[in-house]
Amino acid sequence: MGKNGSQLKNLKSSIRQANLGTRPNNKKSRTRSTESHEDRQAKVQKIQSDFNLFDRQFTKRKFDVGGRRVKGTEGKPGVSRGVGEELRRRTIGAELKKRNRSGAIIDRRFGENNPHLSVEEKMLERFSREQQRRSKRELYNLDAEDVLTHGNRPLSDIDSFEEPGFGLDEGEELNDEVVRRMHFGGFEDSDAENEKEGEGAHKSKREVMSEIIAKSKHYKAERQAEKERYEDEREKLDEQMEDLQSFLSDYKKASRKSGIKTQRPIISDGDARYDSFVREMVFDKRAHPTERTKTEEELAQIEADRLRELEDQRISRMEHYQEDSASEAGSIEDEQATDNVFGFGKGLEQENEEEWNGINEEAEESEDEESVNSDTSFVDDEQLKVEEQPLVGSAIKNEGSEKASLAYTYPCPTSHVEFVQLLKGLDYKDYPTVVSRIRTLHHVKLHPDNKSRLENFSVILLQHILHLTRQPMISMELLEHLTEHLHSLAQQFPSALGISFISVVEGMRKRLAKSYVYPEIKFPEISDLLFFNLTGSIFPTSDKKHIVVSPVMLTMAESLSQSPADSLSDVCKKLYIANLFLKFQSYSHRYVPEVITAVSQALYLLYPNFISIVPGTFALPDSLKEKQNLFAIQDISLDEPQRLSLYELEELPTGLLQSSILFITLNLIEMAIDIYFKEQAFIEIFVPIMDMLQLYSLKKELLSKRLSEKLLSTLQAVSDSIESAKANRKPLALQSHRPLGITSQVPKFEEGYSLDKSSHDIDPERAQLNKLRAQHRDAKKGAIRTLRKDARFIARERRQEQRAKDQAYNEKMRKLENRLQHFDPAV
């Protein structure tokens, strides 16, 4: 191709050089060209590709080295696209045309798909197989020379017709044997027949069936005869039974008179085991169909109907209209039945005397998973608790009023005053029964209005519990049962009870603020402590933020840090709150600094001597420093710690109260170790406590024996925990990383460097791995590109096919419309 001149001149020059544009003028020069049509077409394609610069694509190299040719720098995307399109049309296009077609011609001839066999070998094997198939077909060929129609024997063998049956007259009949032998039965020789009969001739189906029937009848007759024989023997034994019994009775009497002891028969283990199985089967209760599982609404309706029926019977008995002595459904059974309906079981049972842990009375412990069980409380057995006191005086009921009878039905109260009127005259043990019956009769499934009634009743029940906690004496068993019902109602109506709890907390905070100004206002009171415990029993305490628990815990923490300690009873109340905090945080393990401060202050106040330099950094206001001499232990070696009641703190001797408070403090320290052991600041938290305990160990002669042992065990536990925390603590360090090389300005030269290498890693294994990864990546990309091209090709083919169908349909409809337009309606 010439490089000078225009594009048109260069094109003409290329055509002239390829002898494509010359045409002879005279006839002599019109000789037949030796070039074929394909050669001329190839030349045209070459000229077209050379002059079409848009059909070529060049890859610009980053570093161009003169005289160095690299494959892949120049490409022809149009040509490649055309080749790929043609290849897909031959492969994928053919498959698309064959889809949804089941018919095909499959060449199953021998060796057709085996390229290793020659044509002669294929033909020879096919011929041999054809001969084998033909020989099998001719095995029963009727066109053979020998006629073998009678028992596979030729007719020439049957040379005599004087066999039995052929000499009979026309009037005579053929017997079965003649028919069997001669009428297509074999035409066998008589000698052979005689031999077969001697050995055992072939029997017909009729003969076989006759023999089977005869044998069956024979066996049946034998069984019947044996059965009759057994019946006769049994009848004989029955007739002789009376004689045997009389003989045995006479023998027993004679042996008893003579003093002879009869030996009992020896029963083997197998017989004894068999007898036991038989007895179990005899006395085993037969299975009966059970009733279907009832819904909650049906159970509530059944229980409500039962209570109404019992109430009607009670009223009838009171009015002397009915005397039914069989109806004795007492309040205790009724309470158990209603508890089973709502899943209460036995309710919150009172804790055992050995399971009480400290000043926490554990009255409101529920089975909620967020609350803490009483067996995992944080104070030892010999600790303070709110001991159960009998409910006396006008705290609950009027002294002058007569004792009222317990009814079976009660209306749902709308106010606390109305609820108190319902309980008037009843014993405090019947209060949970009344609440249970109110909940049963006004179940939410029985009436649409019961939901609002029970929601209001839950608030009334909370008000009544708070009313009971303000009484001088209160039964812990009563609070347990009422708390159980309140917990169940809180699951149904959390919003209403949450608002009520928040209002109570707001009133507490106001009284707490007033107690800072007016010393005559005491906070916390016993009712406040019981309310704190009630909150932890009703609501989850492990949540980080809770609409009810969070304000309550803030109030408790403020009371621990700000409330004054004017007496040992105030110190005991603070330890009670600290115990509740540890119980609340037993699951979440959140650190509460007020708890550690309260424990440290209690240790400081009870120390026998004045401490000039207080170990640690816990908060110690001046008011406590002034009262240290008032609360200091003098000599309590004879005062063993015991369980205390919050109602009797003011009445106990000082030494006994000091001993019990110190024992409680040591238990709280041990429980705090278990909760806060994983804290990062565990060492800093408990080192001041360990220092205080070491000071107490110097004065252990002033303590009782049990208290001294508890002090040493607690000190050992604290010191061991601190040592373990020190061993687990790792000092701060910079982030570890591989050493970095010092940067150098000297250029790096590699021997054997080549531009063909894509990687210059000196590690051959890593280089090979990177090479395989690169190959896998390239192959994956190529496969994805191929799949996308195939998908586009299939889409184009389907569009073309659909376009052709639409065009054919439109053409057909157009022809029909033309015919209808020229159609004469008269015809």
UniProtKB/Swiss-Prot annotation:
In-chain residues carrying the UniProt-annotated modification Phosphoserine: S190
Pfam families tied to this protein: Nop14
MF-aspect GO terms: snoRNA binding
Leader sequence segment: none
Organism superkingdom: Eukaryota
InterPro entries, per database record: Nop14
GO biological process, alphabetically ordered: maturation of SSU-rRNA; ribosomal small subunit biogenesis
Region Disordered: start-end pairs: 1-47, 215-238, 349-384, 798-827
Keywords: Nucleus, Phosphoprotein, Ribosome biogenesis, rRNA processing
Cellular-component GO terms for this entry: Noc4p-Nop14p complex; nucleolus; nucleus; small-subunit processome
Bias kind Acidic residues: ranges: 350-372
Keyword Phosphoprotein set for record: yes
Listed Basic and acidic residues bias regions: 32-42, 219-238
Composition bias, Polar residues: 1-24
Places the protein is found: Nucleus, Nucleolus
Family membership noted in the UniProt record: Belongs to the NOP14 family.
Subunit structure: Component of the ribosomal small subunit (SSU) processome.
Physiological role: Involved in nucleolar processing of pre-18S ribosomal RNA. Has a role in the nuclear export of 40S pre-ribosomal subunit to the cytoplasm.
Family annotation (PANTHER family): NOP14, NUCLEOLAR PROTEIN 14
Protein name, entry field: Probable nucleolar complex protein 14
Species this chain originates from: Schizosaccharomyces pombe (strain 972 / ATCC 24843) (Fission yeast)
Lineage of source species: Eukaryota, Fungi, Dikarya, Ascomycota, Taphrinomycotina
